[in-house]
Amino acid sequence: MHVATQRRNNILNNTLTNALTIDVEDYFQVSAFAPLIARDSWPSRPCRIEANIERILLLLETRQIHATFFTLGWIAERYPAMLRRIAAAGHEIASHGHGHLRVWEQDAGAFRDDVVLSKTILEQLSGQAVAGYRAPSFSIGAANLWAFDVLLEAGYRYSSSIYPIRHDHYGMPEAPRFAWRPRGAGGLLELPISTVRLGRRNIPAGGGGYFRLLPYALSRQLLRRINAHDGQAGIFYFHPWELDPGQPRPPGLPLKTRFRHYLNLGRMQARLERLTADFAWDRMDRIFLKADYA
């Protein structure tokens, strides 16, 4: 069956549109690499972001999908033409912070400077108003909910920064699984990455390394459950480096880090092609910044 026809049929059978999101950072900026890759070495590292973004844009154009690109200010400053190309293709530009500092590594003042700087850079270069923010490594949790006050003051309208799971580097498993306002009515809207509730645990269902680890059929079933059982739009994310099995491999990485980062990179493109054909997708702002959410 022709891909476009298949996708139309799939959409007819799935009334909900899900949010497709990309965290725009390069391979050497991953938080798990921080102990081995000094921040001041970033400018001298071979960047692969442009080629990987082009691959993503081609896939989205083929599928006629618009997505949200949570972009580092650091990347935007160095690749302004790439950022403009993303925006010109009709995608939402959102912030991933400036220098990929985890929120818990900063106090309120430093965090404010980071999110204001990234928002300013992204808006100036893209010509779009930036409404959304995603914390590097989902680094907002119970101990630093003050970050939502800072984001609201800085002019953001929503965040996608809390992952309601248990993980050794991040997570707030007690948090709501769907849209909520951590600071109460009038506070910033938080849109968590998708999970499925099984027993007493939330099972990751929204991308990242779990999407590369789990069989595709299971990932598809989890997302379908969110749409059909929970009646909610799913939120899925991935990184450009996940489509790049040929990326440089820094020496000295711990075994667990190597497993998590490099697992099934060579299969990611094909899985994304299936995922984008099996579900309807759109930008975060178009799905969630509507009267029933905002």
Give residue ranges: language-model regions.
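Metal-dependent polysaccharide deacetylase catalytic core of the NodB/CE4 family, i.e.
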Residues: 63-144, 156, 161-168, 186, ...
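Active-site-adjacent pocket scaffolds in enzyme catalytic domains
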Residues: 128-131, 135-237
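Active-site beta->alpha N-cap acidic-glycine motif
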Residues: 12-92
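C-terminal domain-boundary segment and adjacent tail
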Residues: 62, 158, 214-294
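Conserved, mostly hydrophobic/aromatic
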Residues: 23, 60, 96, 118, ...
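The substrate-binding groove and active-site-proximal loops of carbohydrate-active enzymes
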Residues: 39-47, 70-72, 99-111, 136-139, ...
